[in-house]
């Protein structure tokens, strides 16, 4: 009976939405191809190791009997992990439980939900705009967006706000339908969203509330009561968590203050700096803001309310995200589907041009960043001729270097195709391969970067970068990151002195690994992401203890 019902429904779906026959396979290729080629990089390794503790203890912890992870965010004596909300960790732990502790298992749930995001965006756009061609193009933009694809392929929570934003706003806009509104979908999704990434949820739900207040007369009065009920139930299942994790709000700023003048967390200008950082990144990779005025042209007045919703939610998300210590683009991931809709709306409904022109513009937006950074090239030339303007402090120098590096013509979509079709191998991949042959679980090993990832793959007792003592005598010492020159250059830091003392007191053989001495395997930050396997004349050095 169930099969008889599903069969015709699936056939009707395929007939009515033929573009999905292209979009779904395309999304699968872009997300899944080469998914497990590279080892888990530093942030992936840390989160995945936290997830693996769930398999041992039932709850996420900072430590197990092998190593500890993210000690900078530890606030409870029992080591219970409360730095972030738990749903992504239980999601990943389920995959590890079923498939084992592999790279593929660590990334699989996030990749699956990435493809689901594309499908959800198609139907959400169709519901919102009521145009199949706009729904198709918005979805195409999202699954051709390299930052989004990298997030979907990352073993972390960073891509989940994309899906949850779509589901949350979809459940919200049904309140304006001419039928009885059920508050349960938005309630359940809100609770899940909060316990996935509460800062992103706060931004989107704030936008929803603002939009609802502005358009409250467009829905039935009975829905006010139902919306209030949804808010109360959501609060019951979310607000206690903020009380539970309150100590973390003091702990994390302390960690960043220790970083010196690299990060501004106290000056009155920090919010403006963060705002400029978010706008710069979104403009360069997601939505070229030179097109923003087109949203207010006459041909798009029919979609005034829909545009308003997307802009309000994007703005509120950015406003809340300004509270973060660093303006990472990942905090704006929830805006990606909304900006994709606006971009598709401009091209399909806003421009009265021939279809060939639309296709050319679409291809330009996907394959190049010409429209994104073109208006900034003249500014870059001016800055390049006046570098002294940015020499006052480290922050200004860093901002200048980022601007000069990022404002140039790029073809990141093409580079992504190269990455997924050619196995990426970074320094950590070579290190893991070396120890799977030469090391064994239980060996003690000091490594100056990505210790969680190494422990995840090898089962070795890995010593954290800053925890090495002069009295330690690890079986292995790997220098490839922050302290790779600690021995030869006679660095004065305590860690460098401890390493030199260990090598002086104990016999070690020196091995030079044919891998570049780079501190991280890769990163999901599009501005720093490597698409091809790196090379360097500076090689990783491994010391093996020889007195046994």
Which functions belong to the PLM regions below?
Residues 397-480:
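Short periplasmic/luminal acceptor-recognition loop of GT-C membrane glycosyltransferases, typified by
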Residues 151-152, 161, 202, 288-292, ...:
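Hydrophobic/aromatic-rich transmembrane helices and adjacent perimembrane loops
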Residues 346-347, 369, 473-548:
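Aromatic/acidic, Gly/Pro-rich catalytic loop(s) in extracytoplasmic/lumenal soluble domains
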Residues 52-53, 192-196, 201-302, 318, ...:
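Transmembrane-lumen/periplasm boundary regions of multi-pass, lipid-linked membrane glycan transferases
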Residues 9-18, 122, 127-128, 132-133, ...:
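Membrane-interface helix-loop-helix junctions at transmembrane boundaries of multi-pass membrane enzymes
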Residues 127-132, 166-186:
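Membrane-interface transmembrane helices that cradle and orient dolichyl/undecaprenyl
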Residues 21, 108-129, 167:
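Transmembrane-helix motifs of polytopic, lipid-linked glycan transferases
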Residues 231-235, 347-399:
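Signature aromatic-anchored transmembrane alpha helix within multi-pass, membrane-resident enzymes
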């Amino acid at each position: 009976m169930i099969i008889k019902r599903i069969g015709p429904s699936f056939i009707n779906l395929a007939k009515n939405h033929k573009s999905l026959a292209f979009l779904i396979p395309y999304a699968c290729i872009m997300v899944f191809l080469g998914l497990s080629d590279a080892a888990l990089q530093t942030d992936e390794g840390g989160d995945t190791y936290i997830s693996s503790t769930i398999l041992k203890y039932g709850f996420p912890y900072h430590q197990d009997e092998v190593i500890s992870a993210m000690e900078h965010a530890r606030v409870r004596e029992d080591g219970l992990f409360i730095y972030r909300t738990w749903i992504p960790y239980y999601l990943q732990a389920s995959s590890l439980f079923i498939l084992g502790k592999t790279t593929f298992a660590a990334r699989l749930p996030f990749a699956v939900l990435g493809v689901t995001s594309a499908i959800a965006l198609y139907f959400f756009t169709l519901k919102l705009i009521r145009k199949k061609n706009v729904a198709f193009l918005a979805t195409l933009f999202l699954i051709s967006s390299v930052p989004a694809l990298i997030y979907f392929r990352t073993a972390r929570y960073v891509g989940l706000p994309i899906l949850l934003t779509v589901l949350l706003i979809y459940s919200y806009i049904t309140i304006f339908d001419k039928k009885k509104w059920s508050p349960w979908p938005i309630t359940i999704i809100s609770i899940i969203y909060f316990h996935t990434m509460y800062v992103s949820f706060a931004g989107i739900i704030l936008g929803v509330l603002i939009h609802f207040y502005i358009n409250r007369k467009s829905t039935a009065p009975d829905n006010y009561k139902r919306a209030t009920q949804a808010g109360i139930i959501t609060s019951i299942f979310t607000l206690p968590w903020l009380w539970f994790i309150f100590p973390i709000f003091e702990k994390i700023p302390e960690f960043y203050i220790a970083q010196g003048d690299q990060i501004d967390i106290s000056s009155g200008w920090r919010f403006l700096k963060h705002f400029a950082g978010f706008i710069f990144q979104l403009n360069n990779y997601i939505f070229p803001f030179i097109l923003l005025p087109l949203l207010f042209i006459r041909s798009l007045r029919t979609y005034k309310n829909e545009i308003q919703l997307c802009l309000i939610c994007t703005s509120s998300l950015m406003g809340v995200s300004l509270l973060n210590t660093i303006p990472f683009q990942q905090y704006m991931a929830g805006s990606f589907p909304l900006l994709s809709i606006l971009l598709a709306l401009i091209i399909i409904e806003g421009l009265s041009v021939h279809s060939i022109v639309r296709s050319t513009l679409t291809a330009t937006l996907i394959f190049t960043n010409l429209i994104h950074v073109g208006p900034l090239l003249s500014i870059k030339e001016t800055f390049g001729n006046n570098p002294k303007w940015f020499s006052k402090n480290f922050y200004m120098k860093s901002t200048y270097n980022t601007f000069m590096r990022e404002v140039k013509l790029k073809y990141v979509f093409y580079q992504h195709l190269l990455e997924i079709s050619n196995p990426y191998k970074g320094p950590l991949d070579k290190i893991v391969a070396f120890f799977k042959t030469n090391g064994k679980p239980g060996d003690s090993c000091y490594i100056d970067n990505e210790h969680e990832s190494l422990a995840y793959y090898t089962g070795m007792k890995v010593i954290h970068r800053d925890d090495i003592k002069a009295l330690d005598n690890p079986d292995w010492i790997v220098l490839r990151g922050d302290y790779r020159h600690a021995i030869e250059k006679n660095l004065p830091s305590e860690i460098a002195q401890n390493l030199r003392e260990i090598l002086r007191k104990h016999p070690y053989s020196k091995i030079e690994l044919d891998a570049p001495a780079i501190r991280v395997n890769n990163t999901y930050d599009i501005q720093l992401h490597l698409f091809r396997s790196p090379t360097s004349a500076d090689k990783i050095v491994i010391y093996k203890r020889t007195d046994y």
